[in-house]
């Protein structure tokens, strides 16, 4: 649905009375990502999509309130014991954690997504990971897959045999440039973010969905972005409720879903 994740009216319209079992979402990081990508492209360091992300360049107080309003809707939508995964930037870690606590949530663990390539920036250490807050709504036990091998670090290796020639060339260029200190090493991420500037790998999202929900359960993504959560749910037999504020990314999500399923999306209401 095209709407705001901070609006109770919009969220109620999306849910239509349904209760969510799981939330996997990737809110704006408040890092003005589109502007950074434009600068990198000017010096030949980036060829990724650099469209602006809405609500990604706020002052501290406004961003905290934005997160508070989103968390309020998230906690309201989840069943007791419903799990949430919140990707975020370490630079805004305090806001992400404190706003969650103010809404009655808590951080049980912080997971680390380790990428296979650094993100170029102006800081001394180039970022090569993203944290993800993990927790659940109090009031009942939460579901977790019967697997005691899970760790807080996701390190999916790149399958070189499956990469195209262009992807291999791109990876070699990144590796040649990567003679700098990084926060941490290894991961598999999209070689090019052609449809969304911060697109998450479907495999990464799929792991979280599989770990914390059962087939046919309801999964909500308050910031649909490129549609990776919806695609992962489609592949794993979950029902996804996805909200996205920007109409152009609504089109991206629909296009990815139609290509995956071979079906045609239907507009329910204007």
Per-range role (PLM):
Residues 1-250:
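Core catalytic lobe of class I
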Residues 248-259, 263:
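Short alpha-helix adjacent to the SAM-binding motif of class I
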Residues 263-270:
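Short mixed-charge
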């Amino acid at each position: 649905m095209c709407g705001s994740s901070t609006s109770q009216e919009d969220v109620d319209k999306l849910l239509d009375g349904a209760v969510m079992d799981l939330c996997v979402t990737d809110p704006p990081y408040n890092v003005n990502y589109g502007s950074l990508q434009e600068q990198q492209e000017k010096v030949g360091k980036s060829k990724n999509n650099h469209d602006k992300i809405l609500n990604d360049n706020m002052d501290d107080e406004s961003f905290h309130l934005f997160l508070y309003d989103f968390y309020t809707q998230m906690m309201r939508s989840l069943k007791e014991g419903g799990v949430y995964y919140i990707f975020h930037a370490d630079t805004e870690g305090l806001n992400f954690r404190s706003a969650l606590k103010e809404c009655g949530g808590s951080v049980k663990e912080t997971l680390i997504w380790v990428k296979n390539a650094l993100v170029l920036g102006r800081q001394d250490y180039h970022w090569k990971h993203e944290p993800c807050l993990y927790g659940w709504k109090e009031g009942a036990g939460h579901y977790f897959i019967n697997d005691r091998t899970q760790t807080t670090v996701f390190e999916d290796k790149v399958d070189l045999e499956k990469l195209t020639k262009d992807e291999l060339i791109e990876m070699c260029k990144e590796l040649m440039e990567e003679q700098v200190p990084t926060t941490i090493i290894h991961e598999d991420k999209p070689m090019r973010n052609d449809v969304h500037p911060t697109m998450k790998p479907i495999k990464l999202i799929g792991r979280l969905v599989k770990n914390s929900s059962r087939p046919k359960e309801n999964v909500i993504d308050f910031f649909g972005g490129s549609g990776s959560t919806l695609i992962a749910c489609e592949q794993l037999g979950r029902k996804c409720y996805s909200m996205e504020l920007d109409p152009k990314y609504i089109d991206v999500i629909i296009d990815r879903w139609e290509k995956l399923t071979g079906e045609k999306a239907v507009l329910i209401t204007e």
